């Protein structure tokens, strides 16, 4: 197959994996912050929040403890080879990593803004959207972009188990001793990595300015 189309496929896999992990973390990382359940940020302590804390934290630990390659080997039994199994494998592992990092961002927040909101009579919803998310979102975006840089490098690993992209073609070329194709794939892979690194750095600067 054309190296350019494989590069686009690899890039799509990395973007899909990062997006899936990011969306899943946005929906679940708040219960994984201990200070939200014990009232340190101004809210009332909640037993339900404590139970959610342990459940979500356990999920983060499980998903990041299993390497991307193992996730890919499991998923490939249920799905046809292609970028979707690779994206799911990468997304699951990075969900655990990004989730832990994001929860720790909330745990390290300055509690004074949320306490001031609570003292002014704000609801939990208002505390969340005016006190917690504005503080945590820039750091979350920074971590997500960093993980994208890691994901684009790991696509070649999951590709070895027929998860699509440059990784799969790299394995096939090595198996048939097509070293000229191997060199071409490495060249395109380096272009992808450098391009994603540069784009990620630019987007991180935008996130910090905001």
Kindly give the residue locations of the regions a language model identified.
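Membrane-cytosol interface at the C-terminal ends of specific transmembrane alpha-helices
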Residues: 74-77, 81-132, 138-147, 198-201
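Short amphipathic alpha-helical coupling elements at transmembrane boundaries
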Residues: 5, 9, 53-64, 104-119, ...
């Amino acid at each position: 197959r054309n190296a350019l189309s494989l590069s686009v496929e690899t890039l799509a896999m990395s973007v899909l994996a990062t997006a899936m992990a990011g969306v899943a973390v946005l929906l679940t990382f708040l219960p994984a912050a201990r200070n939200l359940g014990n009232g340190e940020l101004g809210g009332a302590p909640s037993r339900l929040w404590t139970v959610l804390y342990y459940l979500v934290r356990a999920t983060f630990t499980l998903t990041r403890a299993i390497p991307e390659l193992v996730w890919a080997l499991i998923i490939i039994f249920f799905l046809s080879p292609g970028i979707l199994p690779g994206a799911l494998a990468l997304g699951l592992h990075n969900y655990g990593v990004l989730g832990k990092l994001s929860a720790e961002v909330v745990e390290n927040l300055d509690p004074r803004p949320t306490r001031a909101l609570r003292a002014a009579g704000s609801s939990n919803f208002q505390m969340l959207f005016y006190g917690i998310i504005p503080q945590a979102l820039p750091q979350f975006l920074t971590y997500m972009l960093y993980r994208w840089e890691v994901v684009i490098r790991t696509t070649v690993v999951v590709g070895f188990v027929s998860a699509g992209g440059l990784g799969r073609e790299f394995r096939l070329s090595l198996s048939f001793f097509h070293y000229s194709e191997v060199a071409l794939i490495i060249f395109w892979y380096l272009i992808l990595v450098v391009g994603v690194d540069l784009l990620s750095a630019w987007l991180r600067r935008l996130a910090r300015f905001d």
